[in-house]
């Protein structure tokens, strides 16, 4: 029973995120970012109340309280608390649609993320990384040093991907030197 409630809660959180993203991305009538964030916070509260009223499975779930502060605190993946600054929407924790950065030419509506946080525009290839590692290995082998290579997997999600979709798998190879 606990597992079923958890699955239902995940589905509701996903619906909330989609509704929040659409409200935020389509709001072009107000050029004030702070006002948009306030409106976003209200939308989060309204969406959670609607889900509480329409889904009996969530009546006993502590993450779906009808208190505005509790709703924001218990939906940590949304990061839509009024105390969050603008960078919280650009650091990979958001679920924005692609169109958020391409709505129009108005800087206040585009919500452009700093390149430091915008993972969508940073791409690296395995061949580039492998080329650097090969060069590193050859250089150290020539110095009669033993090279031990280890491979680990790191799973990361892209900012605009849906939470339940398969995540991107990245292989990173580390070299450790011994004399």
From Swiss-Prot:
Compositionally biased region (Low complexity): 15-90, 126-137
Highest taxon above the source species: Eukaryota
Protein name: Putative uncharacterized protein DDB_G0286751
Compositionally biased spans, kind Basic and acidic residues: 1-14, 138-147
Region Disordered, residue ranges: 1-90, 121-147
């Amino acid at each position: 029973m606990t597992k079923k409630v958890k699955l239902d809660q995940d589905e509701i959180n996903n619906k909330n995120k989609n509704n929040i993203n659409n409200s935020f991305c389509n709001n072009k009538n107000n050029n004030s970012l702070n006002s948009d964030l306030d409106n976003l916070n209200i939308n989060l509260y309204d969406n959670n109340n609607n889900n509480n009223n329409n889904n009996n499975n969530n009546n006993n779930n502590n993450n779906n309280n009808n208190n505005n502060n509790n709703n924001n605190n218990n939906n940590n993946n949304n990061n839509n608390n009024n105390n969050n600054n603008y960078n919280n929407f650009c650091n990979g924790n958001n679920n924005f649609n692609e169109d958020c950065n391409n709505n129009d030419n108005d800087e206040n509506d585009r919500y452009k993320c700093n390149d430091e946080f915008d993972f969508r525009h940073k791409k690296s290839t395995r061949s580039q990384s492998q080329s650097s590692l090969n060069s590193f290995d050859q250089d150290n082998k020539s110095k009669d040093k033993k090279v031990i290579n280890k491979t680990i997997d790191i799973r990361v999600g892209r900012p605009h991907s849906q939470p339940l979709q398969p995540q991107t798998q990245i292989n990173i190879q580390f070299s450790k030197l011994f004399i």
